[in-house]
Amino acid sequence: MSQTPSSLRDLEHHSAFVERHIGPNDAEIAQMLDVVGHACLDALTDAIVPGNIKSPAPLALPEAITEEEALAKIRAIADKNTVFRNFIGQGYYGTHTPKVILRNILENPAWYTAYTPYQAEISQGRMEALINFQTLCADLTGMQIANASLLDEATAAAEAMTLAKRSAKSRSNTFFVHDAVHPQTLELLRTRAEPLDIVLRVGTPEEALQAECFGVLLQYPDSFGHIGDHAALADAVHAQGGLVAVATDLLALTLIAAPGEWGADIVVGNSQRFGVPFGFGGPHAAFMACRDAYKRSMPGRLIGVSIDAAGNPAYRLTLQTREQHIRREKATSNICTAQVLLAVMASMYAVYHGPDGLTRIARRTHRLAAILAAALRSAGVTVGERFFDTLHVKAIDANAIHARARAAGINLRAIDSEAVGISLDETSTRADVVALAALFGAQADVDALDAATADALPQGLLRTTPFLTHPVFNTHHSEHELLRYMRSLADKDLAMDRTMIPLGSCTMKLNATAEMIPVTWPEFGAIHPLAPAEQSAGYAQLIDELEAMLVECTGYDAVSLQPNSGAQGEYAGLLAIRAYHRSRGEAHRDICLIPESAHGTNPASAQMCGMTVVVTKCDANGNVDVDDIRAKAEKYSDRLAALMITYPSTHGVFEEDVVAICEAVHAHGGQVYTDGANMNALVGVAKPGKWGSDVSHLNLHKTFCIPHGGGGPGVGPCAVKSHLAPYLPKTLGGEGDVGMVSAASYGSASILPISWMYVTMMGSAGLRKATQVALLNANYIAKRLAPHYKTLYTGRNGLVAHECILDVRPLEKTSGIGAEDIAKRLIDFGFHAPTLSFPVAGTLMVEPTESESQHELDRFIDAMIQIREEIRAIEDGRLDREDNPLKHAPHTATQVSASEWTHAYPRELAAFPLPSLKQQKYWPPVARVDNVYGDKNVMCACIPVDAYKEDVEA
């Protein structure tokens, strides 16, 4: 049989990546379309998406290219960055990422594809790593409790300010800020304070002694390196009912007294120098630690210790009632995504080095700084006296010094025309000291100076208390030991390297390896965020091109990539709306309409902008109630600032009236904010900027393939129409009407290559097909499960968008089995649960994404059908209403292999509810975790070893 010769163009197959990213092949797509009753993807799309919002033309983006072609293109971009030796400091320091951590955490999908650990039983490994992080931060700061990461140090400082405002006895509205905090921290404080009517006063610690304030923020050591003694100031602030917040450096705290020892109430900082590269500003894991009295007002996630159903220690997210997904506008913060992956890296860095290793790194860094200071003084140069790693070099011609430094491939901190800063770090060498001294005309005989030079640490502030005494920080110091420890933790968890994660509103899609590769290139990782612009030309091109891609995908006119989470993107968008109204003399507009189905970050972000939240209703079909929006827009016409909606809705449908809703809000002077959480249902199909929306945030860690990392990092770009463009966040040192919302001008810049790679490899047609298959996969699940579970809401033609809500509330009435029981039973089948009880209590929201194959969808469907059969057995009396596999799920290997089995159902049903599980089975490390016990007995540090010993002995 002869074959028709293929052309070279046919064989080149530039769209190969599209077929790798999209799970179902064309044959499977045809079968699935047949199940949902549509002839092709375009027909299905037409049946789902309202005609008045559909894009009339394809995305004006290039065609798809191969992985190899895309990697070559981004390599050329990366090569435009120039890597200098960086001594800039200002909160960012050189560090060596241990290769065992680089390969087995940062480059390991078992870690980077996991989701936030809401389902405790399948997140024990990740939560152990995070509780190590919390212990690290609490120990070094001298605090009683620490959280599981914040977005960056400056954001953490702003959160410390609002925590102090909530918690202080003082009725003052003034917050005093040390004039030697990092400049980016001061910028963030100004952004956060203004909408909340908090008065910032900036000055010296001595001036703070005379200030009436609800709190102070001190930098320790300060931004210029000086280590101050602030004990008297802390006493004075406490005497007037205020709180003391401190921004600090974890490495320095191995040598100098912990802030908690001299009166701090709240301590924040950045863990970046614990093994995480500069990355042009991020992502890095910040932290907050505080006294136990303030734990219930503390922002961010907290990992705590509880017990499971067998009485064994188990980790869980604790005190969640503080958070935005529960308390909404009354939450302590709008924080959702944080920096879990980077916190895990920092915690493993501490585990690997241990207290002795960290102290050695700190001592070596300090010795190099002290030797350099001595060399400079010998040449008549003025240098600060009490420092850890940073020298404030004064009375010089700074421009001349910078010119010499640049010629030598060195970056120093620019302070003013007569001063520079020099920060040493783990990567600094003897040769660096010699080269740095030479810039000032000094000679450095390192050994001679070392012998003759005393430390520059203040004797009255030396650390005397032990830290990191738990065995986990004193055991895994060989590479084999750490490798096996990290593997043991990863094996406890479910991530996307094992299974689909069908979380609604979370878009857990493929994070392709080719997309991830550029992240670890030094051309991206080794660029300091404050390096001269000519050294970051590659980043400038990458940012410009990615912004243009996002503008095209959304229909807006301008984008800021600064927000480093979706919640920060919301905040930036609402600040833009607020500033726009003020520019028009309408500062009184402060009402934000938000549907009752909205994500919890929406009202929390509105509150942070000083807006008053007014909740609007949803109708019986799950749509936002258009009449209620019109009525409330009219009622609050003079004060209406904005409407926040999610589209498609959080109920999983394309609402027909979105254009009319936008028109109604605009008619009363308001702006429309469209939450971009569900943008994966829109790319290549519809553009919010074209149907009347004024601003959106996007989630690059959802729609555009940045991995979730177990709870961060993320990027939440803010996209706006042209009239709001002047009110996007400014850059550090730049001009603008709205301040910064992240510490770095371009946020988590080093992970932007992931989204650039995704768009470049998918191309215009591939992005549209991805959206269409996401719609298909969700409708396929809804259709196949229809005989077993009701889909709560559907849109036009009885179809859903990219996710569906399964209503299991009727089953609870007939069997006593609720959504949580089903979620836990899915663990026995090797699945992460869908989103539980959001946006409707007692339901499960399923979002499969386009990356899941028909085989994986069918595996999930089979599990859900089997669970329905188990529920039916309860309804029929064949299984006991209390003693059944759903009520006792998940089942551990220890339980099902125990010599005694006390349940009324067989072990095989518990462990292997489907035959396929006998070939491949995930065993949860703990049984169902007791949430009530965990909140009543809050413990957020490493578990004592004897707790495990008791478990073994039992």
Curated annotation (Swiss-Prot):
HAMAP family in alphabetical order: GcvP
Gene Ontology CC terms, in alphabetical order: cytosol; glycine cleavage complex
Task performed by this protein: The glycine cleavage system catalyzes the degradation of glycine. The P protein binds the alpha-amino group of glycine through its pyridoxal phosphate cofactor; CO(2) is released and the remaining methylamine moiety is then transferred to the lipoamide cofactor of the H protein.
A molecular-function term among this protein's GO annotations: glycine dehydrogenase (decarboxylating) activity
Domain of life: Bacteria
Keyword Oxidoreductase: yes
The protein, known as: Glycine dehydrogenase (decarboxylating)
Keywords tagged on the record: Oxidoreductase, Pyridoxal phosphate
InterPro entries: GcvP, GDC-P_C, GDC-P_N, GDC_P, PyrdxlP-dep_Trfase, PyrdxlP-dep_Trfase_major, PyrdxlP-dep_Trfase_small
Subunit structure: The glycine cleavage system is composed of four proteins: P, T, L and H.
Stored Pfam families: GcvP2_C, GDC-P
Enzyme class per UniProt: oxidoreductase
Requisite cofactors: pyridoxal 5'-phosphate
Catalytic activity: N(6)-[(R)-lipoyl]-L-lysyl-[glycine-cleavage complex H protein] + glycine + H(+) = N(6)-[(R)-S(8)-aminomethyldihydrolipoyl]-L-lysyl-[glycine-cleavage complex H protein] + CO2
GO BP of this protein: glycine decarboxylation via glycine cleavage system
Modified residues (N6-(pyridoxal phosphate)lysine): 702
Enzyme Commission identifier(s): 1.4.4.2
The keyword Transferase is assigned to this record: no
Protein family: Belongs to the GcvP family.
